[in-house]
Regions:
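Hydrophobic residues in beta-strands and at strand termini
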Residues: 62-64, 77, 87, 102, ...
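Hydrophobic membrane-insertion alpha-helices, especially the h-region
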Residues: 1-3
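Exposed beta-strand and adjacent loop surfaces of beta-rich binding modules
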Residues: 82, 97-99, 129
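Extracellular/periplasmic metallocenter environments
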Residues: 5-7, 11-24, 32-54, 112-168
Length: 168
């Protein structure tokens, strides 16, 4: 086989042009004040996370920060429950978003920007243990950002629980 042409694709980073950082820095918001997050389901610290049930509706108040979710182990969800994941990104750096996905979502994922709380609904259709994970590369330990939801049969007596941060 004869090679006809060998060159980088369009947008190859070596063709980038530099500009002075001062042109951008004055216009950038560098940190996000979590106190301005007015979402009623915002968990502004890991100690504010947890799970609650109201009939067939489960609310999970969750946080994400490099490189873990809290809680990252949830039990007692039942088949057919509407599970609302309310995820607050505790990052303060302007360029560290986190993603969230779990098997069976009606859309592919959720992207949560620093300081923001976003909500996604998941309805499990079968019994099992379902992994959730971060879909946006955030750090060298990105693959550690994962957790599990254990789904029990409808009417099960498995208590609704989630792990809490250790008191180190």
């Amino acid at each position: 086989m004869e090679l006809l042409l060998d060159f980088p694709t369009i947008g190859e980073p070596h063709y980038a042009q530099a500009i002075p950082a001062s042109l951008l820095t004055e216009k950038q918001i560098k940190t996000f004040d979590l106190a301005t997050n007015a979402d009623p389901y915002a968990a502004l610290s890991e100690s504010a996370t947890g799970v609650t049930r109201s009939g067939r509706t489960v609310h999970v108040k969750m946080t994400s920060i490099r490189s873990h979710f809290m809680p990252d182990n949830i039990e007692g969800v039942q088949v057919g429950d509407s599970v609302y994941f309310h995820i607050t990104n505790l990052e303060q750096d302007w360029d560290v978003p986190h993603g969230f996905a779990i098997t069976g979502l009606n859309n592919s994922e959720l992207l949560i920007m620093p300081g923001e709380t976003r909500t996604i609904v998941w309805v499990p259709s079968k019994v099992g243990v379902f992994p959730f994970y971060c879909t946006d590369f955030c750090s060298a330990l990105h693959q550690e950002m994962q957790g599990w939801v254990r789904v029990s049969p409808r009417g099960s007596s498995v208590a609704l629980v989630a792990n809490k941060p250790s008191s180190k």
